């Protein structure tokens, strides 16, 4: 069994929305944070909130060699300047029973400069596709002022209650201790709903660990696709992902916050770095390694049910829909580059497993 999978909440839209809200001033008072967390918040707003595309569509355009939102060149076309950086993310060529094919890639939603230029195999898969399929197109939402205004309202309690009334004393205490490592006081978060607190902490963790959501693989490919005029297919939507976060029960967030017990800023950064290292080598199974009995110590039977519910909603239920979307696209003969989070492909109940059970074959791409 797997404990509640906090790292699965680190998908692009959560960080993007928190970053936009930071830029709008809708985050805890910066006086409650130390210099490092102030810097992280500022960086998040600067690098993630202004996700724009540049250049005109070109029939010869291709994936750029490195993500740079400041580029204003009239074309996104580049050379195939591939460096040897050891980045070999998991990628498959999937073939349907009827013989149609699709290239599928496992993404990591926040990356570092060292990941670019992309490996040639990834560049080729993008350039050869007519359609880029992603979880959701966050670049279109970042400029929607009305959407962000409504989202900001949902961050806050509007019934005169506060965070401490919605989670247990144990969860509150664990969260308070963990916030201390970030130089934050929990009192600054009392008016925020649990999903907003969680997303804010995720964003701080991403930035303080040296990652950049704007350089995340999906965001980079989306920006490039818009510049190239390439068709984009949303497997889900921003609304779907945000509603998923917003509608998780207080019990789920209570368990999530209790999981901070014994954690520090450094331990969380190391956990994220371990996942990143696994992603770079194409080791997707690391994302879903089972916890041993020692790691599950302290989990009641009710906790295990809550964790299972969360993991099903965040991962396995979505995997089914993602696999179905891939099958639909292949049945239409679409030439698609299919890019969703790496964890969605892993293990039993992952996209590859589901496709193989439906008679599809999946061949791992070798770099």
Label each residue range with its predicted role.
Residues 303-367:
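A cross-kingdom marker for long, charged
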Residues 85, 96-97, 330-332:
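Extracellular/periplasmic catalytic domains that process cell-envelope and extracellular macromolecules
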Residues 52-94:
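N-terminal low-complexity, Pro/Thr/Ser-rich intrinsically disordered segments
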Residues 22-33, 37-49:
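Bacterial lipoprotein signal-peptidase II cleavage site
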Residues 2-4, 89-90, 118-120, 323-324:
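A generic local structural motif
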Residues 31-32, 38, 60, 71-77, ...:
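Phosphate-group recognition and catalysis centered on beta-loop-alpha active-site segments
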Residues 79-80, 90-310, 314:
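Structured, acidic catalytic/metal-binding patches in enzyme active sites
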Residues 3-28:
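Sec-dependent N-terminal signal peptides of Gram-positive bacterial secreted proteins and lipoproteins
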């Amino acid at each position: 069994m797997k404990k509640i999978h906090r790292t699965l909440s680190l998908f692009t839209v959560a960080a993007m929305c928190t970053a936009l809200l930071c830029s709008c001033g809708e985050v805890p008072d910066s006086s409650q944070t130390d210099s490092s967390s102030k810097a992280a918040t500022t960086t998040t707003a600067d690098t993630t909130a202004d996700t724009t595309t540049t250049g005109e569509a070109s029939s010869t355009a291709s994936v750029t060699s490195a993500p740079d939102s400041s580029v204003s060149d009239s074309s996104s076309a580049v050379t195939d300047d591939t460096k040897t950086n050891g980045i070999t993310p998991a990628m498959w060529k999937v073939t349907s029973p009827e013989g149609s094919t699709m290239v599928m890639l496992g993404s990591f939603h926040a990356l570092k400069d060292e990941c670019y230029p992309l490996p040639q195999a990834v560049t080729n898969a993008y350039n050869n596709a007519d359609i880029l399929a992603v979880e959701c197109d966050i670049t279109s939402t970042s400029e929607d002022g009305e959407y962000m205004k409504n989202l900001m309202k949902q961050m806050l309690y509007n019934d005169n209650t506060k965070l401490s009334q919605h989670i247990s004393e144990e969860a509150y205490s664990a969260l308070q201790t963990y916030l201390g490592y970030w130089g934050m006081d929990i009192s600054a978060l009392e008016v925020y709903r649990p999903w907003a607190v969680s997303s804010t902490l995720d964003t701080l963790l991403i930035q303080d660990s040296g990652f950049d959501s704007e350089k995340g693989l999906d965001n980079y490919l989306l920006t490039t696709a818009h510049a190239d005029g390439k068709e984009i297919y949303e497997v889900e939507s921003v609304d779907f992902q945000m509603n998923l976060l917003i509608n998780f029960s207080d019990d789920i967030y209570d368990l999530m916050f209790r999981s901070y017990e014994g954690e520090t800023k450094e331990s969380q950064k190391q956990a994220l770095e371990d996942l990143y290292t696994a992603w770079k080598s194409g080791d997707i199974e690391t994302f879903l390694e089972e916890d041993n009995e020692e790691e599950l110590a302290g989990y009641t039977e009710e906790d295990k049910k809550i964790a299972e519910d969360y993991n099903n909603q965040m991962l396995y239920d979505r995997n089914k829909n993602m696999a179905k979307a891939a099958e639909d696209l292949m049945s239409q003969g679409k030439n698609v580059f299919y890019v969703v989070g790496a964890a969605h492909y892993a293990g039993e109940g992952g996209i590859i497993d589901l496709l193989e059970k439906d008679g599809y074959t999946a061949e791992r791409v070798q770099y």
